[in-house]
């Protein structure tokens, strides 16, 4: 199944179940909570890490659909950007060699 179809299916399920589809702030908070749950499961070496990561993907795709964002297209564009970036290791920190001064910790 293509990601766009999955986004639509997730959004439709939210509508069908009466879940939030209008409060973007709430969706970001719920997504944050799912990330925390996944981290906790990983930290405690639980077998539910995969399920928690799936929850993150579901919330992310639902939020993308609410915002009218084609997540698959955005991911493809970002992967291309990341692939073409050049970094330089400076004092143990990877830095982009472009004008962006934001360091990326290794």
Predicted regions and their residues:
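Flexible "arm" and connector segments at domain edges
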Residues: 1-106
